[in-house]
Every structure is written in structure tokens, then in C-alpha cells.
Curated annotation (Swiss-Prot):
Protein name: Hainantoxin F6-34.84
Compartment list: Secreted
Keyword Secreted tagged: yes
Disulfide pattern: C2-C15, C9-C24
Gene Ontology MF terms in the entry: toxin activity
Tissue specificity statement from the Swiss-Prot or TrEMBL entry: Expressed by the venom gland.
Keywords: Disulfide bond, Secreted, Toxin
Organism annotation: Cyriopagopus hainanus
Family to which this protein belongs: Belongs to the AVIT (prokineticin) family.
One GO CC term, this protein: extracellular region
Length: 30
């Protein structure tokens, strides 16, 4: 599950912002 204002990416990352393809980050980035 992703944080607030984030969406799941098919590659298992969380995306924030509108340009999801440019803002993908790994889950739980410390």
C-alpha cells in the first residue's frame, strides 16, 4: 500500500504527484 497522495505502480513502487512515471519510488523508502 502506498502513502497518502500516492498510487501503486505495476513495478511494485509507489508514485507521488501527477507524473507518476517520473516519480516512482520504492516502498517504505527510509
Amino acid at each position: 500500500e502506498c502513502w497518502s497522495q500516492a498510487a501503486d505502480c505495476s513495478d511494485g513502487h509507489c508514485c507521488a504527484g501527477r507524473s507518476f512515471s517520473k516519480n516512482c519510488r520504492p516502498y517504505g523508502g527510509d
